A protein has these predicted regions:
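RecB-family 4Fe-4S metal-dependent nuclease core
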Residues: 1-271
């Protein structure tokens, strides 16, 4: 059971998202513990997050950002460390060299445009919200500053206002801010770093109210009930997620004929 042990089991925003996209993928990852190495695009995101974390953690005490070069180096180093743990090769994705260059470009935008905009109070802060049901909620806030919660996302396409307004993950962060500070976040912000020919920053702000929190609670209760009942419904056949490019379990999934298409291989350095 995910998040189990001596404490009450918990769900995270990413677990809820996985369960609702594909219950079978959730079962294999969080119930059976069958971990699949991330794609190189995910490792890129991890690298940029490392650069942001290194800068903002020291900024809490200093009030100043690190030099741009230091933030870039921290991001690239985070990317390289991520690769040492293995990654899933995508023939349609970037090469390692190109991916590393993209990380450096994204980190440049991060350092020049995002970092100067915030004086953080909390960075990469784990928050547990105790709930009356079978599961608590546990998540990590990227950044809190001036009553806001900020989440950094690297994407290939620009996110939309509609997406941000509805994201349950961001609703959780707004609630988690109250656990940290006693106040619900006055604004939730996505700092979207977009991988285009010229990487760009898009800041998308939103708010959350009681109806958003009620909707999140309903999702948590539904997912928790499904897990307790052992119900793990697979993704719809033909959905974007149900493909070898986006699901590492595809080739061995009992709900698809994985022999028809195989485009990914697991690469582990040194093997």
């Amino acid at each position: 059971m995910p998040g189990s042990g001596d404490q009450k089991p918990y769900l995270s925003p990413s677990q809820i998202e996985t369960y609702l996209r594909c219950g079978e993928a959730y079962r294999r990852r969080y119930v059976d513990g069958e971990r699949i190495a991330p794609g190189i695009v995910a490792v890129q995101g991890t690298g940029v997050h490392v650069g942001a974390e290194v800068n903002f953690k020291q900024k809490i005490g200093t009030g100043s950002d690190l030099p741009v070069r230091d933030i870039i180096d921290a991001s690239v180093d985070g990317f390289d460390r991520g690769l040492t743990e293995g990654w899933t090769v995508d023939p349609e994705g970037p090469s390692v060299g190109d991916a590393r260059d993209e990380v450096a470009s994204l980190a440049t935008v991060l350092a020049q445009e995002v970092c100067p905009a915030y004086q953080p109070t909390h960075v990469e802060q784990t928050v547990r919200i105790e709930l009356p049901g079978a599961h608590d909620m546990l998540g990590v806030i990227d950044l809190a500053a001036d009553g806001k919660v900020i989440d950094l996302k690297t994407t290939g396409k620009t996110m939309t206002q509609g997406q941000v307004d509805k994201l349950p993950q961001i609703t959780f962060y707004a609630a988690a801010h109250k656990v940290l500070t006693g106040e619900i976040a006055n604004e939730v912000v996505i700092e979207n770093l977009v991988k285009s020919k010229k990487p760009k920053r898009v800041r998308i702000a939103s708010t959350r109210d009681k109806r958003d929190f009620s909707a999140l609670a309903a999702r948590i209760n539904a997912v928790s009930a499904g897990i307790q009942a052992g119900v793990f419904v697979p993704a719809e056949a033909g959905s974007w997620m149900c493909s070898p490019r986006w699901c590492g379990y595809y080739d061995s999934c009992p709900y698809v004929n994985g022999a028809k298409t195989t485009i990914v291989d697991l690469h582990v350095p040194g093997e």
